[in-house]
Amino acid sequence: MITKLDFIAVPSTDAERSRTFYVDTLGLTPDEKGHFEFWVGGTCFGIWEPAKMGFEFAPQHNAHLALHVDDVAAAKGELEEKGVEFLGDVFDTGVCHMAFFKDPDGNDLMLHHRYSPRTA
């Protein structure tokens, strides 16, 4: 039935503000055809405003977007220099490093790096 993930979208109350955060703070490159879309690896990531479609805005919690980086601690430091506030320190799960933060609308985000292969 389901064959792939087509895109991921986060809700926003101000898509322009969110776009600025994702471009200027996180360094994502906007898709040339979609002002509020970005290609991250092979996945399309978008920003949408629920109110413009008649839906109530609610930030996403506990459904983290895991953003891959080569070094979580270094990336966390770079983002902290840009004013991003993290929810605690870098976590080591035994297979990956993670650090949690929020976008301007309060959506949960995570820096992530898997350092151990998945086991079957």
Per-region residue spans from a language model:
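Short hydrophobic/aromatic beta-strand element in the GNAT-like acyltransferase core
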Residues: E37, A66, M98-F100
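N-terminal beta-strand motif that seeds the catalytic metal site of vicinal oxygen chelate
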Residues: M1-R17, A63-L65, Y115-A120
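Short secondary-structure junctions
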Residues: L26-K33, F86-V90
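Vicinal oxygen chelate
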Residues: K76, E80-A120
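Short amphipathic alpha-helices within nucleic acid-binding modules
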Residues: F21, A73-E78
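Conserved short beta-strand elements that form part of the metal-binding/catalytic scaffold
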Residues: T29-Q60, D108-R114
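Helix N-cap motif at beta-to-alpha junctions
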Residues: D14-A15, D70-V72
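Amphipathic alpha-helical segments
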Residues: D14-L28
